């Protein structure tokens, strides 16, 4: 049984990522990160030689498109506090199934604090290109994103998988957005469970792997 460590980021819903902690895993350290938590997880993977990394909706660089979305979120915050931030975020962070749900939106909004939102915005606005950290670990990597993620569209995840030094798998899940581990919890848990146990890389005839 390995050790699972979580890096939930600053905008995770109050439920967090604790539902991953009981999954069986191979020996070694297994790091599970959401959004900007990917950078902290990669640094730990580099320092401690993690066996695997699960990156959910990873954010490792800021480009002009992401900067424009951050500017809109900051404008919402400055105009109407966390409520304004949440209203702008509703269109960016949620997939089509969740965006219309007042219950899901209220649960996420409840976990926001002005201090936390400002810290997140400052971190994101100061982000450069941190993909180089992917070259610092040979841990196998699983990237999971929502196909309807308007904040960090699937090409961000493709970049992560392409930059990975070790083995990498990438999945996009339909009907989910940026908050994919909560919007598509069952599907994400199934993928992560197979990955942590090593099932995602079973050897096949001819030297291939699943």
Predicted regions and their residues:
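Conserved alpha/beta-hydrolase catalytic His-Asp/Glu region
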Residues: 64-66, 82-135
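Conserved HGGG/HGGXW glycine-rich cap/lid loop of the alpha/beta-hydrolase fold
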Residues: 1-25
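Short beta-strand/loop motif that positions the catalytic acidic residue
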Residues: 137, 143-145, 149
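Catalytic histidine neighborhood in serine/cysteine hydrolases
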Residues: 162-179
């Amino acid at each position: 049984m390995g050790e699972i460590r979580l890096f939930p980021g600053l905008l995770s819903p109050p439920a967090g990522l604790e539902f991953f902690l009981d999954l069986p895993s191979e020996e070694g350290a297994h790091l599970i990160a959401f959004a900007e938590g990917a950078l902290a997880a990669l640094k730990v993977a580099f320092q401690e030689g993690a066996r695997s990394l699960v990156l959910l909706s990873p954010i490792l660089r800021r480009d002009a498109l992401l900067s424009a979305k951050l500017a809109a979120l900051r404008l919402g915050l400055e105009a109407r506090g966390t409520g304004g931030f949440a209203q702008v975020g509703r269109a960016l962070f949620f997939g089509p199934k969740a965006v219309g749900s007042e219950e899901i939106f209220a649960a996420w909004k409840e976990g926001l604090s002005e201090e936390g939102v400002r810290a997140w915005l400052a971190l994101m606005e100061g982000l450069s290109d941190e993909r180089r950290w992917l070259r610092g670990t040979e841990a196998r990597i699983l990237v999971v994103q929502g196909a309807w993620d308007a904040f960090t569209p699937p090409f961000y995840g493709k970049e992560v998988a392409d930059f990975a030094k070790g083995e990498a798998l990438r999945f996009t899940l339909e009907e989910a957005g940026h908050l994919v581990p909560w919007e598509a919890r069952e599907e994400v848990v199934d993928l992560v469970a197979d990955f942590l146990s090593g099932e995602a890389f079973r050897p096949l005839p001819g030297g291939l792997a699943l």
